[in-house]
């Protein structure tokens, strides 16, 4: 397919547009069922397990989730899934016991902030709710950017288009505004009620679409001749399928995907409680059953995710698709470079390097591929070299110009001042390369799928991802809206608001969050894999909240002072990590080089990580900060939990009355019967 060729047949457009219009119309019709604030915020707490399950299924499938999954599997394969299954008993026990969910429902709190006020204080309600909303918005604000780039690449849309021949509009901005407008409109129509109903309708479309795509992928590729040889072509220690041969994997490895995830199941169950539809169930039992059913209903989606990742690995690495794969890499890197590199001269050199890159016909096992050396790195290394060479050339020209047009002597070149300028120029080149590489990894799925899918099925795939994007966007925007409106803004009105004003206040907050998402997507530079970016973004809340939430629900000695100290400590640690990680290539590493500290800092990092063997290896890298977000957040959580316990034991003068918070014993409501046992 040529660069100017249209990818959507009219059949594809029909398949895409009609279901989307039906979903929007259904959301619009939910308005007449909103009779009060409870209906708008919590569906009147009338949802049963099956409605919640269907809505949660639609919300679970998302563009950003699929792209993040494919990024991870393309880098580390599928062997970690074996060890991930070891966590199933733990998750089942948590689901069956209603761990954290039951206790939260017993507090009768309708939001996180209300719980924080009941357990700690009114001030910590406002602070904690605002902090969680900010963390949630920072993590989710790249969703419109990921979706816009995805559809631009997949549909081969131009970077700009003319509006009525008067204004040249960036397609990237237009798509972000369009996606956010649709999602926020659904929220304004019916709030949680619209999310649940449209999510259920979308799930009805998603199941047959998913099944069709699974059948096509299995038909398109030969399992024995193409898929398995490609997946098995890895060096020792980085196997894609052998769970006992993964010691050299980085970023997504045994520690990040098993140890950290197991820790999160226990200590982060209550982190995002009270958001989205988690307060819409008519009872805690229905919420628990919806969670259990969700684990089963998502299996079809998991199969689709897995096969798409297998499809991508095979297409981009098997010699039968070498020419097409080279075209994909050229398209990806060219458009990524155009978005990141602002200097026209540098961009021209990079585009020339990309255009000259030949196809790579890799013979299976000769040599085996690895994370450090594979077909993508062979391509990207050419771009990195072009960027660094260009940075040095431009710096030399600037120095010659400052020297009156005379070439610098060896003594001048060796001076610390000149070397510092070279170091920072190299850092800027590394920073640009990191951004290009991130977009390259993020968008390879969209370009690959447009090369593979035929007419009709291509429209079905677009519909699948558009509905996935829509359900996820409105759910996550409303989650942040609910916390911000209920726990930050509403307490500012001591006399409360009328139901009508209350609902309109929530709507305006949702619109404001949509604006925040737009500007965040437009100006935020993503420097890492999506999962690692999300971990970093939510760290300002997640670093300190496990102790505050879980121990707040289960431990009577936790104090308000301990909660304040823990949350503030988590913020300080997280902000420091974010600043270092974001500015590592262009400022921090050049600074360390200037002051001859690279070796000493590298030795210190190696010493700290050495007790963990192959699980954690912190080695100096001029492009990427050695400590990834999973590792940082894990150790930050350990520290803040211990800190919370110590401060609580020091400041606790009287045990907190847990019975009053949970409405037990003499505090139980008169005339309210205990929930009847329900059959499975």
Kindly give the residue locations of the regions a language model identified:
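Membrane-embedded helix-loop-helix hairpins and adjacent transmembrane boundary segments
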Residues: 1-680
């Amino acid at each position: 397919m040529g660069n100017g060729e249209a990818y959507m047949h009219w059949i594809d457009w029909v398949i895409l547009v009609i279901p989307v219009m039906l979903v929007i119309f259904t959301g619009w019709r939910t308005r007449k069922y909103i009779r009060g604030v409870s209906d708008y915020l919590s569906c009147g707490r009338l949802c049963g397990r099956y409605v919640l399950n269907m809505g949660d299924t639609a919300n679970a499938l998302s563009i950003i989730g699929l792209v993040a999954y494919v990024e991870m599997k393309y880098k580390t394969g599928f062997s970690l899934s074996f060890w991930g299954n070891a966590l199933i008993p733990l998750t089942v026990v948590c689901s069956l016991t209603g761990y954290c969910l039951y206790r939260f429902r017993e507090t009768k709190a309708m939001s996180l902030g209300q719980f924080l006020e009941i357990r700690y204080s009114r001030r910590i309600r406002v602070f904690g709710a605002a902090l969680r909303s900010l963390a949630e918005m920072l993590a989710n604000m790249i969703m419109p950017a990921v979706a816009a780039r995805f559809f631009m690449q997949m549909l081969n849309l131009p970077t700009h288009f003319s509006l009525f021949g008067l204004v040249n509009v960036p397609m990237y901005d237009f798509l972000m505004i369009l996606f956010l407008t649709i999602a926020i409109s659904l929220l304004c129509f019916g709030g949680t009620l619209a999310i649940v109903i449209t999510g259920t309708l979308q799930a009805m479309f998603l199941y047959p679409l998913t099944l069709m795509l699974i059948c096509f992928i299995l038909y398109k590729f030969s399992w024995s001749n193409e898929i398995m040889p490609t997946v098995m072509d890895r060096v020792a220690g980085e196997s894609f399928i052998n769970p006992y041969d993964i010691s050299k994997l980085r970023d997504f490895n045994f520690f990040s995907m098993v140890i950290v995830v197991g820790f999160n199941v226990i200590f982060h169950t209550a982190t995002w409680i009270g958001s989205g539809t988690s307060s819409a169930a008519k009872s805690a039992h229905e919420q628990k059953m919806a969670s259990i059913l969700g684990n089963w209903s998502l299996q079809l989606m998991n199969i689709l995710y897995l096969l798409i990742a297998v499809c991508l690995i095979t297409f981009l690495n098997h010699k039968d698709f070498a020419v097409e794969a080279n075209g994909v890499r050229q398209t990806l890197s060219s458009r990524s470079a155009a978005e990141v590199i602002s200097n026209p001269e540098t961009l021209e050199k990079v585009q020339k390097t990309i255009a000259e890159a030949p196809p790579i016909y890799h013979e299976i096992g000769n040599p085996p591929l690895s994370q450090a050396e594979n077909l993508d790195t062979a391509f990207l290394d050419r771009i990195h070299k072009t960027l660094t060479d260009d940075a040095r050339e431009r710096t030399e020209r600037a120095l010659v110009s400052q020297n009156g047009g005379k070439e610098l002597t060896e003594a001048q070149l060796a001076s610390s001042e000149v070397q510092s300028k070279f170091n920072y120029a190299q850092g800027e080149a590394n920073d640009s390369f990191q951004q290009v590489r991130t977009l390259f990894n993020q968008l390879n799925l969209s370009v690959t799928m447009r090369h593979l899918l035929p007419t009709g099925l291509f429209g079905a795939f677009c519909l699948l991802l558009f509905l996935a994007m829509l359900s996820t966007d409105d759910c996550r925007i409303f989650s942040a809206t609910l916390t911000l409106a209920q726990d930050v803004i509403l307490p500012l009105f001591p006399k409360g608001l009328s139901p009508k004003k209350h609902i309109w206040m929530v709507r305006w907050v949702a619109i404001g969050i949509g604006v925040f998402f737009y500007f965040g997507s437009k100006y935020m530079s993503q420097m890492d894999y999506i999962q690692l970016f999300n971990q970093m973004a939510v760290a300002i809340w997640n670093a300190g909240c496990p102790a505050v939430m879980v121990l707040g629900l289960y431990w009577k000695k936790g104090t308000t002072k301990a909660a304040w100290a823990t949350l503030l400590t988590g913020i300080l640690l997280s902000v420091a990590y974010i600043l270092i990680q974001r500015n590592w290539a262009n400022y921090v590493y050049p600074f360390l080089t200037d002051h001859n500290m690279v070796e000493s800092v590298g030795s210190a990092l190696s010493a700290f990580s050495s007790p963990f063997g192959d699980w954690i290896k912190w080695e100096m890298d001029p492009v990427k900060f050695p400590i990834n977000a999973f590792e940082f957040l894990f150790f930050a959580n350990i520290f803040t939990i211990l800190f919370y316990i110590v401060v609580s034991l020091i400041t606790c003068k009287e045990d907190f009355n847990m019975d009053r918070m949970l409405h037990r014993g003499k505090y139980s409501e008169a005339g309210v019967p205990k929930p009847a046992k329900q059959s499975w």
